[in-house]
Regions:
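HotDog/MaoC-like acyl-thioester-processing domains
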Residues: 93-94, 104-150
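Short structured motifs
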Residues: 19-25, 83-89, 109-111
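Hot-dog-fold acyl-thioester-processing enzymes
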Residues: 38, 42-64, 76-77
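Residue-level preference for beta-strand/loop junctions
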Residues: 17, 31, 79-81, 95, ...
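Catalytic strand-loop segment that frames the active site of acyl-thioester-processing enzymes
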Residues: 20-50
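Residues located in well-ordered beta-strands
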Residues: 24, 86-88, 100-102, 127, ...
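Extreme N-terminal tail/first-helix region
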Residues: 1-16
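Hydrophobic beta-strand-centered segment that forms part of the acyl-chain substrate-binding groove
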Residues: 66-105
Length: 150
């Protein structure tokens, strides 16, 4: 099993709230990830579309998976914390959703900063699309990563 496969398997179980909402991590790579959430009553709102909170949960989970992929080789020795997030709801989200997350900038530079400075802060952008391929939200999550404190 590759480090990316292990991350994918672990993240799908590690965050109970994301699991409760039905979020699954579909792909993980170096600084990238894809996640999805099926449309079901538990994630719907008062007008029968995807609830804004479910959209945010999906985006945050995808960003966390992209972060994990960035540090796949030493993730267990790190303490990642989502420090800030912003979301722009672009369209009504209809049906199942997919999130595509990507580290902004150069993944190697992010790793090098952690190595040289002992900590790093960087943004991950996430695009949410619905079943029809319509972009329904744009999200940025700023992460802070430092060594795990024992």
């Amino acid at each position: 099993m590759t480090p990316y496969e292990m991350i994918k398997a672990h993240l799908s179980r590690a965050v109970p709230y994301a699991t409760y909402t039905g979020v699954t991590i579909d792909e993980v790579g170096a600084g990238v990830a894809r996640a999805s959430v099926p449309m079901r009553p538990e994630v719907s709102n008062h007008i029968g579309t995807v609830h804004a909170g479910a959209m945010f949960t999906l985006a945050e989970a995808a960003s966390g998976a992209a972060l994990a992929g960035t540090f796949a080789d030493n993730l267990l020795s790190l303490r990642p914390v989502a420090a800030e997030a912003s979301i722009r709801y672009l369209k009504v989200a209809k049906g199942s959703l997919t999130a595509a997350a990507r580290v902004d900038g150069d993944v190697e530079a992010v790793r090098a900063t952690l190595e040289s400075e002992g900590k790093v802060a960087f943004p991950i952008t996430v695009t949410l699309t619905d079943e029809a391929g319509v972009n329904v939200a744009a999200v940025t999550v700023s992460w802070h990563v430092s060594p795990l404190r024992v």
